[in-house]
Amino acid sequence: MGRIKPPHAESYVGLEEYRSVGPGVGGSLKLQPEDFVVREITPEGVVLDIESDVPGDMTPLDYTHFTLVKRGWDTMRALKELSKRVGVSRERFAFAGTKDKWALSAQRVSVRRVPMERLKQVRMTDITLKDFTYSDENLGLGALSGNRFTIRVRGVSSGAAE
């Protein structure tokens, strides 16, 4: 069985080796953020969508929840920049889990006492805020069922897909 050491990015997330009984198919992973799509799964089992926008409860409460869609941003950097844009401390933002920087990802975020109208005005390169709703609860780390991954392998050897 052949063993190949993966690049640092894969080692960082726990992928320590590739194994194959055959010669392998070749190819490259994560050449573009769209090659690695990460969609958070809510505790209710809903897989977040990258594109559609679903409005929620519009009755103002303490927390605004929204879906953060980002391309090529890590979670902490995105929230730091977002906090500057809306003029509040980064500590007012909460999320269920961080997502890979070199990916196109969708994750739920909450922010305390920032109206959705202010968030809807934010324009950032490679970041979209959507699916706004109000809640009386903050998000907590780990408040998700998991993540759904879509991975594209580019440059696969001819005939390997068979």
Functional labels for PLM-detected ranges:
Residues 1-162:
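Terminal domain-initiation and capping elements
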